[in-house]
């Protein structure tokens, strides 16, 4: 058994192993292999500021584990163990990757390791830690339970994440008209304008960088990176899926939500052109929507901007979908968690992220 660096000669084998973990599963769907390919070929915007070292463990000429080790210039204290996949539990194989991550940290002057963070929180954070028998939703992680054991048994600190769900069929009005009128006196919510898509991404990036500057694992984004993130997703989205809340005509917050496209992606399919076509023809088959990301600039927090976004979103989804599912929230983020508890029905899937301080 040995650790092998990924080169142009074996890159296809790396990608094939990654995709196999999703395409052969009844519960999982492949939505990230396209981005991973751009990363491995050096074509992603992130490659301009991120060191990547894809590695794989080979045993008897068979790949058994893969990862991309990452060092981001804007988060230099970490070496990230990204895009981690393992076809079966093998601690010896994991320790080969872990040892290389520690060595990479020494080389790059980093002093921490992360597990489950994929380059940046916008691309994924957290291994699944519950509901392993449930289907994966679009944009969320799904993995065997033993993934967590690799990190928990090797001295990593666990960071708990939680998502929420809500019954949209039997749900009462989110707020009454009196509150809605008061919100409308201060805030207005608008759809994004796809005719000026690049400019809308400028607004999105600006709010992100203000809203999440103190968030765990967040580092400043560049507009070009967010544009790359959205340019393919845009073909599945409608303008109403990216909302902005404004005060006196100035954007102060946003909400990204979209249908759970995994409900129309079949087993063995990769998210792509076929998904776009199926979404145009059969979007009514999707019964769940996801609130993926929300952000409000610090000066407008706890003043109603988030509530205005929720109200706008729920009015447009109430009779279209049966269920709402949120993205993950840090379990220690009491304000976000309490908001989820108040406006959702119950907790949904749990996830875990990992950090290890190197001495």
Where would I find each of the regions flagged by the language model?
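Short amphipathic alpha-helix that is part of the acyltransferase structural core
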Residues: 1-43, 50, 56, 182-222, ...
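Conserved donor-binding loop and adjoining core beta-sheet/short helix segment
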Residues: 25-136, 236, 246-264, 268, ...
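Acyl-donor binding region in acyl/amide transferases
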Residues: 76-154, 272-342
